[in-house]
């Protein structure tokens, strides 16, 4: 299983690898990009998970494919050494390599869908990004199966790349949080890369002015563009355990994101009993309709009003906290792992005969 230690893919892959290992599988978790720090390594406690570092470039950081020859050699040698039964790729380009084992690709994100959501696409016509686009499309077609973490993002991928097989949807999942304290604290929490336009933190900064409660934002702050921070309290890039601890105490969690293929931090906040205020985008509607307040991500005034309303209405806030917690149980790690195990079994069953990707239908 490939992964990266830069964003939410690490949380997803560490959780899934741990669940698969607990079910008796041996997982070789191969890191592409910068190596994980000690806190992230500590998330891998099962001895049946072997962590392998590659020193290869991340797909979106090597749009022109300069690193591809080294990556191809690295993975060919690794497959020859390990002799895996299944190749689970959490990026696209590696699906174009010559694998012996059946290959599944998970579409966690892509540069083209990010650009469209952020209305920032002019640079995608550059030659290196055209190369990236062709590699993504080829990887989806070359894989024996491909997966999306939400139906909404599945539809986006289909519209952008027209893959030859229909793909399937397996929702991400997490282990349940510890029971939240009896009394939540009166603060609002958000999380995301401040420099990432998709996270829309600048809208939250504008909406934060005049709120009765403090608004804390966790996430990396380096290299982000200058903007008016409003009344946000920036608390930096917390460890995963520290962020989940904050969620245990936060009364409200807000994500005004313009783009989110799934949103693991929202799920973690819901599991911790936070009331959710979310941007009205298809992914969040799919996953949280009826269990959150929704606002137009382009309407700062509506975002301010929604947050002010929940700060002042104890009954509605408590109702949404319960609704989010109950909905989060739908997205369990156990259910996700079982869906992937079923997918792997179908891939193995087709290995010895003519393979047709359309035959695979696995849903969580």
Language-model features, listed with the residues they occupy:
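Helix-loop-beta element that forms the nucleotide-linked donor phosphate-binding surface
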Residues: 141-142, 154-174
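Aromatic "clamp/platform" in nucleotide-sugar-dependent glycosyltransferases that forms part
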Residues: 258
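N-terminal strand-loop element at the rim of the active site
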Residues: 3-6, 22-65, 153
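Conserved donor-binding/catalytic core segment of Leloir-type glycosyltransferases
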Residues: 180-199, 205-212, 216
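Short alpha-helical donor nucleotide-sugar binding micro-motif in glycosyltransferases
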Residues: 140, 245-250
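Conserved acidic donor-binding segment of nucleotide-sugar-dependent glycosyltransferases
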Residues: 236-237, 278, 292-301, 309-314
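Active-site proximal beta-strand in glycosyltransferases
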Residues: 86, 98-121, 126
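Membrane-proximal helix-turn-helix segments that form the acceptor-binding/catalytic region
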Residues: 111, 125-146
């Amino acid at each position: 299983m490939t992964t990266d230690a830069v964003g939410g893919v690490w949380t997803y892959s560490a959780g899934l690898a741990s669940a698969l290992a607990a079910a008796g599988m041996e997982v070789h978790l191969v890191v592409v990009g910068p190596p994980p720090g000690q806190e992230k390594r500590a998330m891998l406690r099962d001895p049946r998970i072997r962590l392998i570092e590659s020193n290869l470039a991340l797909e979106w950081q090597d749009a022109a494919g300069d690193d591809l020859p080294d990556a191809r050699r690295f993975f060919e040698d690794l497959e020859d050494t390990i002799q895996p039964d299944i190749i689970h790729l959490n990026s696209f380009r590696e699906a174009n390599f010559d694998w012996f084992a059946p290959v599944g690709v998970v579409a966690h994100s892509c540069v083209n869908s990010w650009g469209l959501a952020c209305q920032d696409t002019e640079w995608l016509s550059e030659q290196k990004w055209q190369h990236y686009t062709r590699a993504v499309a080829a990887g989806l077609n070359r894989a024996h199966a491909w997966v999306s973490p939400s139906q909404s993002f599945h539809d986006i991928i289909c519209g952008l790349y027209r893959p030859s097989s229909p793909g399937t949807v397996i929702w991400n999942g997490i282990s349940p949080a510890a029971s939240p304290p009896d009394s939540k604290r009166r603060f609002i929490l958000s999380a995301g890369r401040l420099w990432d336009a998709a996270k829309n933190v600048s809208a939250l900064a504008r909406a934060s002015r005049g709120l009765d409660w403090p608004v804390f934002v966790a996430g990396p702050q380096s290299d982000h563009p200058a903007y008016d921070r409003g009344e946000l309290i920036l608390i930096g890039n917390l460890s995963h355990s520290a962020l989940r601890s904050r969620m245990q105490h936060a009364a409200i969690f807000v994500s005004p994101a313009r783009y989110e293929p799934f949103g693991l931090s929202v799920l973690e906040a819901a599991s911790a009993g936070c009331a959710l205020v979310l941007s009205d985008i298809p992914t969040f509607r799919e996953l949280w309709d009826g269990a959150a307040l929704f606002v137009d991500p382009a309407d700062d005034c509506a975002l301010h009003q929604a947050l002010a309303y929940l700060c002042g209405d104890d009954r509605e806030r408590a109702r949404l906290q319960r609704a989010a917690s109950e909905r989060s149980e739908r997205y369990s790690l156990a259910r996700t792992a079982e869906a992937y195990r079923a997918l792997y079994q179908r891939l193995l069953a087709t290995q010895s005969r003519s393979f047709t990707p359309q035959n695979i239908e696995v849903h969580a």
